[in-house]
Swiss-Prot record:
UniProt xrefs under HAMAP family: HisC_aminotrans_2 (MF_01023)
Keywords per UniProt: Amino-acid biosynthesis, Aminotransferase, Histidine biosynthesis, Pyridoxal phosphate, Transferase
Taxonomic placement: Bacteria, Pseudomonadati, Pseudomonadota, Alphaproteobacteria, Rhodobacterales
Assembly and binders: Homodimer.
Modification N6-(pyridoxal phosphate)lysine occurs at: K218
Cofactor: pyridoxal 5'-phosphate
Domain of life, per lineage: Bacteria
Protein name: Histidinol-phosphate aminotransferase
EC number: 2.6.1.9
InterPro entries: Aminotransferase_I/II_large, HisP_aminotrans, HistidinolP_aminotransfase, PyrdxlP-dep_Trfase, PyrdxlP-dep_Trfase_major, PyrdxlP-dep_Trfase_small
Family stated for the protein in its record: Belongs to the class-II pyridoxal-phosphate-dependent aminotransferase family. Histidinol-phosphate aminotransferase subfamily.
Annotated signal sequence range: none
Gene that produces this protein: hisC
């Protein structure tokens, strides 16, 4: 028997379950389980990756100054209030590590991103789940759950896996209603899919209790490189940088992200295609008796009659080489989360669901 005992609480942490990428016995699959951009990264980002290959023997920047400057220029933000990480997950981890510990509580919502309770437990804090209202964040429920032990509120807007979104006015009401010892963390992983939405940046600029995170994994198509960033008051950024590894991002990551964020024409193209096929996919599935809430992200949450039908449909889709995401772990056992793919992928999903429904009729 292993004589080494981990710190208390570590074995209570559930392993994160990512989207499937393979189906046994199926050679060619269409992966629609991880909310990846079907158009991939900007050609400028691809070229930046190639250009950095010959410099792999050189250590990267420790302060990410060029990437922070590019992000600041594109979004109109102060680069000194930006921190970069290995995906936005790492920035979220910095926040939990820096501001929570044993005896503290971290609020997340009923169908919120599964990393939030994991990050809380990693820091020794206690995750507190609050109910949503018809798969939409309930600000009043969050405020009612806050107490003297609360330190963080994690909020994804748009949300994953529901795709729903609350208004900027509601987010502001939440920030205004939190006591001074609580930080509001706005996870804007899908913010770019909403044209004109700043992900909460203006709220961060105006207050000292709000943090925003963003990622290059979704609309920028760089999920395989793992790059994210956060925007917060300078005092908080200073704290987070003290627990950040100095070389946490490689030269390739930094160059690709800088090229990607500067290519906003590519972002607009990806957003427009996603909007077109998200609308089409949701409408066609609704016609087949599979409704979904209005999504503001790059996926839809397709709802079936019950868990049995959802799981049966998932297996049917897999038999046709279509990989989507079961979300029972998000307290949504009767639903499947389907990434908005390209035209061929969306049409294949609708054809398969139609065949599934006809076979069960």
């Amino acid at each position: 028997m292993n004589q080494f005992t981990p710190q208390p609480g570590i074995m209570d942490i559930a392993l994160y379950q990512g989207g499937k990428a393979h189906v046994d016995g199926v050679a060619n699959v269409i992966k629609l389980s991880s909310n990846e951009n079907p158009l991939g990264p900007s050609p400028a980002a691809v070229e930046a990756i190639r250009a950095t290959a010959a410099q792999a023997h050189r250590y990267p920047s420790t302060d990410h100054a060029e990437l922070r400057a590019a992000i600041g220029a594109v979004h109109g933000l102060d680069p000194d209030r930006i921190i970069c990480g290995v995906g936005s997950d790492e920035v979220l981890q910095f926040v939990a590590q820096a501001y929570t510990g044993p005896g503290d509580e971290v609020i997340h919502t009923e169908h919120g991103f599964s990393m939030y309770p994991i990050l809380a437990r990693m820091a020794g804090a206690t995750p507190v789940q609050v109910p949503e209202r018809q798969r939409v964040v309930d600000v009043d429920a969050i405020l009612a759950a806050v107490n003297d032990r609360t330190r963080l509120v994690f909020l994804a807007n748009p949300a994953n896996p529901t795709g729903t979104m609350i208004s900027e006015a509601e987010v502001t009401r939440l920030a205004d209603g939190l006591p001074g010892h609580v930080l509001l963390v706005l996870d804007g992983a899908y913010a770019e899919f909403v044209e004109g939405f700043d992900g909460g940046a203006a709220l961060v600029s105006a207050r000292d209790n709000v943090i925003m995170t963003r990622t290059f994994s979704k609309i920028y198509g760089l999920g395989g490189l793992r790059i994210g960033w956060g925007y917060a008051p300078r005092e908080i950024i200073d704290v987070l940088n003290r627990i950040r590894q100095p070389f946490n991002l490689s030269t390739m990551q930094l160059a690709a992200a800088e090229a990607a964020v500067r290519d906003q024409d590519w972002v607009a193209r990806c957003r427009d295609q996603n909007t077109t096929w998200r609308t089409w996919l949701a409408a066609r599935l609704a016609e087949l008796g599979v409704p979904s809430d209005v999504s503001c992200a790059n996926f839809i949450l397709a709802r079936f009659a019950d868990q049995g039908e959802a799981e049966a449909c998932d297996l049917f889709l897999q038999s046709r080489g279509l990989i989507v995401r079961r979300v029972a772990g998000y307290n949504l056992p009767q639903a499947l989360r389907i990434t908005v793919g390209d035209e061929a992928g969306c049409r294949a999903v609708v054809d398969a669901v139609r065949a599934f429904k006809e076979a069960r009729a």
